[in-house]
């Protein structure tokens, strides 16, 4: 995994604006034309690569445009046995955060009524998901059967990177962590939380290992380490939540046991929705759990106004030797604003002063695709690179 040896490197969290071939790609895939879909996937990846390179992104990804939505039942039912769809009752949310305490706060009653009617994000031109009426539910022993599917997907992406002249072994490929899966995969089979989390971890282990076996860096996306805290209703104490989160971290490490640490980066944020976030758990309460995850690099939301001061945590917490911190220095929460390079540079300099310049890579708070208009998202990555260059001049001279 690359480090900022001579300058601050840049990266992002995975999801980027869809390529111009997106409509044709989806049509080909829906019609079962696998040959045409593969061609268009390659075209799309190469377009995304070009966009990243033009803006100065160092550690790139494929943009994730070809991946199914988080709650796409075909993804789960096609790759794992033991999962099915169960019709949700009238009062049953179809994901864990459906009735978080903040959504019931009278201070924000009109805000959430507006969100219910109009949605969370401005119109970004992104694909929209239909409202779910069923719960994805574990009803029996989980078993992975998607080996051939994931290998085929990874080979298509690898080939597209190769045709674009990119060394895919220095690119990252995101996958959902066990804890994040728990947001929308319910369980009617396992008797305890421990059994549930370890079953999810073991069932998804094949996906994680396939990514690394194909030569990519695995990025494990786990907003749940932070964002699940404000979803419990009634709320948990910090101590009780830490016990719940620690169990999920243990299960995550179980799933990663066969993967070298230097091929893993771990992403945490407080959820990508544009809510007030008044009930977010402070980073100081989970930073030790974060550092317990088997990974070389830790990507953390850090630029939005609710969490911009989180850099202060690193005054009292030592980043372990050999680890890399990827603070978000541009974000999705300011979806219509582009950060100035000077603001980006200042944020990076603060982190570098606390954990060491060679241990910092400039990142984004979360995926920008679908959360910002494409024009704004690409401009944010341009600002990211320009800000990293400014910080590098000041840190290296």
Sequence positions of predicted segments:
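Domain-level signal for soluble alpha/beta catalytic cores
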Residues: 1-397
